[in-house]
């Protein structure tokens, strides 16, 4: 259980509660969650963050009516800056997008601007939105995380409670390496509903070599951990930085979609350009 799971800031969320679905535009459906909820326990404040990054959302179920009443569909690409006061709660995002379904908009650009304006207001930070027609994306190959996969290790695991201390003494020697490690075994649970969240994670670093067995045990220990996607990625980044002290570090997770949305947070303290193609499970 996270230390803030019962925080009063979460009381008003529609997540985990029975809700009515509206199909006429309503920006008030969007709900934010303060990033400080998980950053404060990690000792992170807005003026001392050890990373930059973004939360990348893909919107697969976005539809509205044009000025003649003809339905339009698009796939949306949203990037929410790491400095925003709030992250966007995903169920509220889904409900908000549903409210576009029977609403008329004059142009695609009006839809894009509306999304960007409302998300910025909810997040209290920078947000960019792009809309793609289906023919722009059809035929694109399934992407994959570049790097060495650490999943096929012949080890026994019987602890699935979050254990940051697995990373203690995970580096040894003075030789510096630069490598990219990948795992598809990341699984955590929604902070509120405890429903499973499945993801793949890519870790790029330069520094003393990280023990792959200890890293895998650490990642698997998220299996019963309750936090939002964005919070898990920041926790992983912070733990790796604290225990392994790499010179450079980038952590990027791509989660499977739920409710027509997928969330793909990344955090880095160096130059890093995240690949945005969907993975096999997305």
Swiss-Prot record:
Q: Give the UniProt subcellular location, in the record's own words.
A: Cytoplasm
Q: Which InterPro entries match?
A: GTP-CH-I_C/QueF, NADPH_dep_7-cyano-7-deazaG_red, QueF, QueF_N, QueF_type2
- Functional description taken from the UniProt entry: Catalyzes the NADPH-dependent reduction of 7-cyano-7-deazaguanine (preQ0) to 7-aminomethyl-7-deazaguanine (preQ1).
| UniProt enzyme class | oxidoreductase
Listed binding positions for substrate are 88-90, 229-230
Give the UniProt keywords, A-Z: Cytoplasm, NADP, Oxidoreductase, Queuosine biosynthesis
Q: Where is NADPH annotated to bind?
A: 90-91, 258-259
- Spell out the catalytic residues: 190 (thioimide intermediate), 197 (proton donor)
Assembly state and interactors? Answer: Homodimer.
For this entry, list what GO says about its biological process: queuosine biosynthetic process; tRNA modification
Segments passing through the bilayer: none
Q: Which family does it belong to?
A: Belongs to the GTP cyclohydrolase I family. QueF type 2 subfamily.
Q: Care to name a GO molecular-function term for this sequence?
A: preQ1 synthase activity
Q: Which reaction does it catalyse?
A: 7-aminomethyl-7-carbaguanine + 2 NADP(+) = 7-cyano-7-deazaguanine + 2 NADPH + 3 H(+)
Q: What is this protein called?
A: NADPH-dependent 7-cyano-7-deazaguanine reductase
E.C. no? 1.7.1.13
GO CC, alphabetical = cytoplasm
**What does the record give as its pathway?**
tRNA modification; tRNA-queuosine biosynthesis
**Main location (coarse class):** cytoplasm
């Amino acid at each position: 259980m996270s230390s803030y799971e019962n925080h009063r800031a979460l009381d008003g969320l529609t997540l985990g509660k029975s809700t009515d679905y509206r199909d006429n535009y309503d920006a008030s459906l969007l709900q934010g969650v303060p990033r400080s909820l998980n950053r404060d326990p990690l000792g992170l404040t807005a003026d001392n963050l050890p990373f930059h990054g973004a939360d990348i959302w893909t919107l697969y179920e976005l539809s509205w009516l044009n000025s003649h009443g003809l339905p339009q569909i698009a796939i949306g690409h949203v990037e929410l800056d790491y400095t925003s006061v709030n992250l966007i709660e995903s169920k509220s995002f889904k409900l908000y997008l549903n409210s576009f379904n029977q609403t008329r908009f004059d142009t695609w650009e009006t839809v894009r601007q509306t999304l960007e304006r409302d998300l910025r207001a909810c997040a209290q930070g920078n947000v960019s939105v792009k809309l793609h027609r289906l023919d722009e994306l059809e035929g694109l190959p399934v992407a994959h995380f570049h790097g060495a996969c650490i999943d096929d290790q012949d080890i026994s695991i019987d602890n699935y409670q979050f254990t940051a201390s697995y990373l203690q003494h995970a580096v040894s020697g003075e030789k510096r390496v630069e490598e990219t490690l990948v795992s598809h075994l990341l699984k955590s649970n929604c902070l509120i509903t405890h429903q499973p969240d499945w993801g793949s994670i890519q870790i790029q670093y330069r520094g003393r070599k990280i023990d792959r067995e200890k890293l895998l045990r650490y990642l698997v220990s998220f299996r019963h951990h309750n936090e939002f996607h964005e919070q898990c990625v920041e926790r992983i980044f912070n733990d790796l930085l604290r225990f392994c002290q790499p010179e450079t570090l980038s952590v990027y997770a791509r989660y499977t979609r739920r409710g027509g949305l997928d969330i793909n947070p990344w955090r880095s303290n160096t130059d890093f350009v995240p690949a945005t193609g969907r993975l096999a499970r997305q």
